[in-house]
Amino acid sequence: MRVKGIQRNWQHLWKWGTLILGLVIICSASDNLWVTVYYGVPVWEDADTPLFCASDAKSYSSEKHNVWATHACVPTDPNPQEIAIENVTENFNMWKNNMVEQMQEDIISLWEESLKPCVKLTPLCITLNCTNVNSANHTEANNTVENKEEIKNCSFKITTERGGKKKEEYALFYKLDVVPISNGNKTSYRLIHCNVSTIKQACPKVNFDPIPIHYCAPAGFAILKCRDKEYNGTGPCKNVSTVQCTHGIKPVVSTQLLLNGSLAEEDIRIRSENFTDNTKVIIVQLNNSIEINCIRPNNNTRKSIPIGPGQAFYATGDIIGDIRQAHCNVSRIKWREMLKNVTAQLRKIYNNKNITFNSSAGGDLEITTHSFNCRGEFFYCNTSGLFNNNISNINNETITLPCKIKQIVRMWQKVGQAMYALPIAGNLVCKSNITGLILTRDGGNNNDSTEETFRPGGGDMRDNWRSELYKYKTVKIKSLGVAPTRARRRVVEREKRAVGLGAVFLGFLGAAGSTMGAASITLTAQVRQLLSGIVQQQSNLLRAIEAQQHLLQLTVWGIKQLQSRVLAIERYLKDQQLLGIWGCSGKLICTTNVPWNTSWSNKSYNEIWDNMTWLEWEREIHNYTQHIYSLIEESQNQQEKNEQDLLALDKWASLWNWFDISNWLWYIRIFIMIVGGLIGLRIVFAVLSIVNRVRQGYSPLSFQTLTHHQREPDRLGKTEEGGGEQDRDRSTRLVSGFLALAWDDLRSLCLFSYHRLRDLVLIAARTVELLGRSSLKGLRLGWEGLKYLWNLLLYWGRELKNSAINLLDTIAIATANGTDRVIEVAQRAYRAILNVPTRIRQGLERALL
């Protein structure tokens, strides 16, 4: 059997392989990514920044909140905006919120300004003779002994303004404001806190009625709001929006009960930093408010007692009518229903344990009672009737909380400071809404207990503000973003325009949940929504400020507002400075020459632009941002240097500039310098020639006329270096006149220059010719070497191909021959086996024959 080898066309394989290799190289080159700068991306990060307040304060009102807000806050925005951010999850933490700390400082400022101490009551830190108040003009059938003892009528001696004489005065004090002196005399008292601090009297005409205050973020920052209805105060929030200012928050200072706050939208919400830690307070936000009415029924009068030059002590002069105790009324039905709902929510948190409520366990009066300020008077109400498990067994429709009033109070904002609050004349009535509770849980080591006891708490006013600011956080807008693209900067033109003053803000944050590709398309529209004037986000607010400038005074808060404006401008200038350094001024999308390094992010191009948001991308490359910025700056510096070198070559780009009149002046100067130099050389050579002739015996001052003499053929003309020349006559042109002499010298100089330049050009041409021949010879030899190597490569390739073909042929032939022999042997064996019966039959036939 014969097998023929099949030859393949290796030349076609070489062509296809080269083509495929080229395509691979082109495709790999096309996947190169370059850093691109984007201005106006919806990216932010957590930040603490000074906020400014806004309120609808009435400048004509003497109420302290209005007075403070007029000086401290700007008018509210008539068109507040709230823009939902889709597909964004943001972490909030109400327990670590700088907005709470700022509000704490602001309300302390409000109280210190409202209750500014004017008069030291040191002259009253004396022994007071006090008795229970007896009303002689009115019946006391309805007055209990406790009510009588609640107010003391105290007499004391005071120094008059003139003559230093002593005068006896009297004033009414609440029982809580005086303490008995332990000397056995039951009528001797002194003012409380006299022995531990200096008591100061607040300025007169203090009136309290909290007004809503809005907190606003300055330009370059934003306030994010969590709108999840089941948000518990910490953790991720999926329903996020951005707002210019918070809702109006009434700064009500109270304990145990939260008054006039915001309500939960659906069920009652219970929040705590750690429910298993009994030292952490529990804030309850109600979904329905409960009205609480507080009354001081006594119609008090106020009297003024002079205690020094220009100083007066204001005290309660008399009580008209019955002496009845101050109290607060709460609807029993609503309170009972609210406690039932709170109990149900607490059972979910504490694994269906029995929930009980009890009164405060003890402590300062401000903690053990519901303390608050009612139009300038400080109420301390006993809430044991509210937090009582037997409340459902009582059928009265109203829960009455007995209250006490103090005029010498300890300031909640500072430790160890006491103040005398002036008495308020007339009846006092305060109507408020209970919108939340502050609870504490009893501790213990028995974790297997089936019962949890909760008591009213409070005292730290930060918890009051936290109950309103739990859904807000401040963030800093990062308007610059970098991302990889396939575009590379080719030519950088000098930009002379700039984008209007802008910082990424509010309006465009709605695109934060979009993919990077979708968000980058709308950058122009986003930037147009940024700022107008100083801050576009606050354009309406600024117009309101301009309309009411007469309301604003440059106080501490005025300076704070100016700082916010300066901060906005600084942030804008910083962004513009970076854009300018990178060569991106006036551009929203700016390509660079910096190649993208996969070590920064190994995600593919499509994965980045089609699946990721700008927020996710910023977190991905956060650790490399500054390094990328520095690389962009270095690349721009190198590009500017290259541009400078290129501009230096641009002077040769236009030959017509050579004929400019300003250039001709330079040409004339250069020509004069060259001619002067040549004349100087001519003079030097002339002097040297004269010296040479003098050495030969000629006289330079001779007046002889040179005549021509015919020499004999056998005589030499000269005896020195000129000797040996035959049949050559020398003559010297005789010229007369300055012009002729100048022309002769100039002609000789030009001829001399021409001859020298001609020689130089010939030498240069010869040199170039030799170099060209050498170069051509080298190139020819190199080309021949390359052709030789190529032919050698083709020869060995052909030999290898032939050897391979011969090898395949030999193997095929050998295999075929071997196969034929094997087949032949097998056939013989098969035929032999088939012939066995025949051979046996033939043998038997022979045997029989």
UniProtKB/Swiss-Prot annotation:
Where, by residue number, is the motif Di-leucine internalization motif? 848-849
Q: Name one GO molecular function term.
A: structural molecule activity
The organism that produces this protein has a lineage beginning with:
Viruses, Riboviria, Pararnavirae, Artverviricota, Revtraviricetes
For domains, the record's comment is: Some of the most genetically diverse regions of the viral genome are present in Env. They are called variable regions 1 through 5 (V1 through V5). Coreceptor usage of gp120 is determined mainly by the primary structure of the third variable region (V3) in the outer domain of gp120. The sequence of V3 determines which coreceptor, CCR5 and/or CXCR4 (corresponding to R5/macrophage, X4/T cell and R5X4/T cell and macrophage tropism), is used to trigger the fusion potential of the Env complex, and hence which cells the virus can infect. Binding to CCR5 involves a region adjacent in addition to V3. The membrane proximal external region (MPER) present in gp41 is a tryptophan-rich region recognized by the antibodies 2F5, Z13, and 4E10. MPER seems to play a role in fusion.
Family the UniProt entry places it in: Belongs to the HIV-1 env protein family.
Q: Where is this region: CD4-binding loop?
A: 360-370
* Keywords attached to this entry: AIDS, Apoptosis, Clathrin-mediated endocytosis of virus by host, Cleavage on pair of basic residues, Coiled coil, Disulfide bond, Fusion of virus membrane with host endosomal membrane, Fusion of virus membrane with host membrane, Glycoprotein, Host cell membrane, Host endosome, Host membrane, Host-virus interaction, Lipoprotein, Membrane, Palmitate, Signal, Transmembrane, Transmembrane helix, Viral attachment to host cell, Viral envelope protein, Viral immunoevasion, Viral penetration into host cytoplasm, Virion, Virus endocytosis by host, Virus entry into host cell
Region feature (V3): 294-327
| Immunosuppression: annotated segments | 560-578
Disulphide bridges, residue numbers: 53-73, 118-203, 125-194, 130-154, 216-245, 226-237, 294-328, 374-430, 381-403, 584-590
Q: Which GO terms describe its cellular component?
A: host cell endosome membrane; host cell plasma membrane; membrane; viral envelope; virion membrane
Protein name per Swiss-Prot or TrEMBL: Envelope glycoprotein gp160
The record's misc note reads: Inhibitors targeting HIV-1 viral envelope proteins are used as antiretroviral drugs. Attachment of virions to the cell surface via non-specific interactions and CD4 binding can be blocked by inhibitors that include cyanovirin-N, cyclotriazadisulfonamide analogs, PRO 2000, TNX 355 and PRO 542. In addition, BMS 806 can block CD4-induced conformational changes. Env interactions with the coreceptor molecules can be targeted by CCR5 antagonists including SCH-D, maraviroc (UK 427857) and aplaviroc (GW 873140), and the CXCR4 antagonist AMD 070.
Any coiled-coil regions, as ranges: 619-653
Taxonomic source organism: Human immunodeficiency virus type 1 group M subtype G (isolate 92NG083)
Q: Which residues lie on this side of the membrane: Cytoplasmic?
A: 692-849
